[in-house]
């Protein structure tokens, strides 16, 4: 079978899909590891691990009260 320039065979397309999927898996693993390290660092400093929940629960208000003292 002859392919025009720029066209890929089915095997090459599968390889590209596999490479892209592998890259995505690695990126997700790195992001997850970074989040985990960040959360552990925050816990060691005595802060809640999830800053989004912290803000939703009034963490900003607690900080303001603390600053007034």
UniProtKB/Swiss-Prot annotation:
One of its GO terms (molecular function) is protein kinase A binding. It comes from the Eukaryota. Preferentially expressed in the neural tissues. Residues 41-50 have a biased composition (Basic and acidic residues). Residues 39-69 are annotated as: Disordered. One of its GO terms (cellular component) is cytosol. GO terms for biological process: negative regulation of protein-containing complex assembly; protein localization; protein-containing complex assembly. Binds cAMP-dependent protein kinase (PKA). Interacts specifically with RII-regulatory subunits of PKA (PRKAR2A and PRKAR2B). Protein kinase A (PKA)-binding protein. Binds to type II regulatory subunits of protein kinase A (PKA) and may block the A-kinase anchoring protein (AKAP)-mediated subcellular localization of PKA. The RII-alpha binding site, predicted to form an amphipathic helix, could participate in protein-protein interactions with a complementary surface on the R-subunit dimer. This is A-kinase anchor protein inhibitor 1. It comes from Mus musculus.
């Amino acid at each position: 079978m002859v392919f025009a320039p720029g066209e890929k065979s089915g095997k090459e397309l599968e390889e590209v899909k596999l490479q892209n999927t592998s890259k995505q898996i690695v990126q997700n693993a790195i992001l997850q590891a970074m989040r985990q390290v960040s959360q552990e660092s925050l816990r060691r400093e005595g802060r809640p691990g999830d800053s989004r929940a912290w803000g939703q629960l009034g963490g900003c208000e607690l900080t303001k009260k603390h600053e007034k003292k």
